[in-house]
Amino acid sequence: MKQWVLVKTFESLFAELTERAATRPEGSGTVAALDAGVHSQGKKILEEAGEVWIAAEHESDEALAEEISQLLYWTQVLMVGKGLKLEDVYRHL
């Protein structure tokens, strides 16, 4: 029997982060990341980008995928914090 795994998409992650920003659940790491501000978020993006590069050079594809997911998360946190929408970015793709 085939087991289905729930997959989060770029759009569903953005919706989840936007919801957390609006509802501000207590103890949320996303809320803390948003409250830390752009400087802190930018530093995390740089850190994660470096980890993506290192994983691509020296680690497994699974480790690389995990690092990319973290980079996407922090990029979206910054987007939400700055009030950007997905369409604002898609317009430039």
Curated annotation (Swiss-Prot):
Assigned GO CC terms: cytoplasm
Pfam families: PRA-PH (PF01503)
Localization per Swiss-Prot or TrEMBL: Cytoplasm
The protein's enzyme class: hydrolase
Enzyme Commission designation: 3.6.1.31
InterPro entries attached to this UniProt entry: HisE, PRib-ATP_PPHydrolase-like
Reaction(s) the record says it catalyses: 1-(5-phospho-beta-D-ribosyl)-ATP + H2O = 1-(5-phospho-beta-D-ribosyl)-5'-AMP + diphosphate + H(+)
Top-level taxonomic group: Bacteria
Coiled-coil intervals: none
GO BP terms, alphabetized: L-histidine biosynthetic process
UniProt keyword list: Amino-acid biosynthesis, ATP-binding, Cytoplasm, Histidine biosynthesis, Hydrolase, Nucleotide-binding
GO molecular function: ATP binding; phosphoribosyl-ATP diphosphatase activity
Pathway stated in the Swiss-Prot or TrEMBL entry: Amino-acid biosynthesis; L-histidine biosynthesis; L-histidine from 5-phospho-alpha-D-ribose 1-diphosphate: step 2/9
Gene3D superfamilies linked to this entry: MazG-like
Family as reported in the entry's similarity comment: Belongs to the PRA-PH family.
PANTHER family found in the cross-reference section: HISTIDINE BIOSYNTHESIS BIFUNCTIONAL PROTEIN, HISTIDINE BIOSYNTHESIS BIFUNCTIONAL PROTEIN HIS7
Name under which the protein is recorded: Phosphoribosyl-ATP pyrophosphatase
Gene name in the database record: hisE
